[in-house]
Swiss-Prot record:
One of its GO terms (biological process) is translation. One of its GO terms (cellular component) is ribosome. Residues 48-59 have a biased composition (Basic residues). InterPro entries: Ribosomal_bS21 (IPR001911), Ribosomal_bS21_CS (IPR018278), Ribosomal_bS21_sf (IPR038380). This is Small ribosomal subunit protein bS21.
Length: 71
């Protein structure tokens, strides 16, 4: 869990902004949204497989862009 120590004479708004940024970096909100409802193991596998296919397609597309002729 992210924590923020208040510095001397630091406004609350600045500390709150630092806390929000640290939560964002730690992925707290994304984790909460992901765990909000139960997801069946088959759904988890299906989602992860779809993400892997998407990553692979993106990687192939990036590699093809390298070899594209620029004339």
């Amino acid at each position: 869990m992210p924590s923020v120590k208040l510095k001397e004479n630091e406004p609350f708004d600045v500390a709150l902004r630092r806390f929000k940024r640290s939560c964002e970096k730690a992925g707290v909100l994304a984790e909460v949204r992901r765990r909000e409802f139960y997801e069946k193991p088959t759904s988890v596998r299906k989602r992860k497989a779809a993400a892997a296919v998407k990553r692979h397609a993106k990687k192939v597309q990036r590699e093809n862009r390298k070899f594209q002729r620029l004339y």
